[in-house]
Amino acid sequence: MNNPWLVISIGAILLFIMLILYFRKSDKNKIKAALTVGILLTVFDFILENIGKITGFWESFHGLIYIAYVPIEIFIICFFGGVMWSLILPSKRDDKFSVLFILLSIISATFLESKLVDIGLFGYGNGWTTFHALVAYSIIIFLMHETFYFSYAKFSKDKFNWLSPP
């Protein structure tokens, strides 16, 4: 496999399968909320990736297939990564866990992106730096966290099943 994006995507899918198998008999509302976060992250990232490319702030390189300016592998990573990230959250809010988990996630995401820059899969321009990425990840990860708990509360309270037709 010559494409690192593909390797990362396959890894994300395999981890996703393992977590879904682990959680399949537990709280279905947690899985629905996690899927919501995965979809949100994928859409949000698609918009941001395109804005970044158009403005010259950042760009992804060496994708197999591009949708607008975004490699298909990034869609896969965002969706499955967002779901996996959400499944780690406890069903009931735990502020201490959340603060530590959010901080660890921000640091990890920023570090991993800096490594993507180092190996040539991602690039910055027009003054964008790793610090800017840190701030962006802080906002995105906080939104993912809040989306998970908002969605979980909605699915638990209303018994709304968005996976089934009305």
Model-identified regions with their sequence ranges:
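Aromatic-rich, lipid-facing transmembrane alpha helices and their immediate juxtamembrane interface loops
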Residues: 1-166
